[in-house]
């Protein structure tokens, strides 16, 4: 009975948080999402720099499991894409990294001992930020219509063995995609604030 009360209390807390978020204006939701994505990209950049994977060969980055998704390649192209489509792209990329981040989290033992602790803690933070950002974008998409709610499936094929080279590749791919997500949300933030395109 006590466990049931606790579960009921947790459910009520979640519902209250969702209700409050749904009452928040779209501009504020976009601003919060942009801040969250900025933190996520900063973490991924820091980790790739620490592990020396920043200069990963571009031809191998093109082999990322998300490469099939057609996305704007620069700010000028992103400015031509609708708000709903930008949000859909950001959500698709974010969803595509749910499983790979789990794989990275469970594979830190293959790295040199000195790097294991740093990688483990940072990936845990990236998972937390990803989940928070996903929850925020889900609420935001519900306010922006069907197009924003569309998610393109980008399957991740997990291999039985994962070594340092595979970890390096995944981290480089995640840094690339987290930069895209951050860029798309910054464009949305600019539009929500009615800023001129040239200053976005």
UniProtKB/Swiss-Prot annotation:
Disulfide bonds join 64-173, 190-200. Keywords: Disulfide bond, Hormone, Secreted, Signal. Its main location: secreted. SUPFAM superfamilies: 4-helical cytokines. One of its GO terms (cellular component) is extracellular space. The keyword Signal applies. It is found in: Secreted. One of its GO terms (biological process) is positive regulation of receptor signaling pathway via JAK-STAT. GO terms for molecular function: hormone activity. Pfam families: Hormone_1 (PF00103). Residues 1-23 form the signal peptide. Transmembrane segments: none annotated. Belongs to the somatotropin/prolactin family. This is Prolactin-2.
């Amino acid at each position: 009975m006590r466990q049931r009360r606790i579960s009921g209390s947790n459910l009520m807390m979640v519902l209250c948080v969702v209700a409050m978020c749904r009452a928040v204006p779209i501009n504020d939701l976009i601003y919060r999402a942009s801040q969250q994505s900025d933190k996520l990209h900063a973490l991924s950049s820091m980790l790739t720099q620490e592990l020396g994977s920043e200069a990963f060969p571009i031809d191998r980055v093109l082999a990322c499991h998300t490469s099939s998704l057609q996305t704007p390649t620069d700010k000028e192209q992103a400015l031509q894409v609708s708000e709903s489509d930008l949000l859909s792209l950001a959500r698709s990329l974010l969803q595509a990294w749910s499983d790979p981040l789990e794989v990275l989290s469970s594979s830190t033992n293959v790295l040199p001992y000195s790097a294991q602790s740093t990688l483990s803690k940072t990936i845990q933070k990236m998972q937390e930020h990803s989940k928070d950002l996903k929850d925020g974008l889900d609420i935001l998409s519900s306010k922006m219509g069907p197009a924003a709610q569309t998610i393109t499936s980008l399957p991740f094929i997990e291999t039985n063995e994962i070594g340092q080279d595979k970890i390096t590749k995944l981290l480089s791919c995640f840094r690339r995609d987290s930069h895209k997500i951050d860029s798309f949300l910054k464009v949305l933030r600019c539009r929500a604030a009615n800023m001129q395109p040239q200053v976005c």
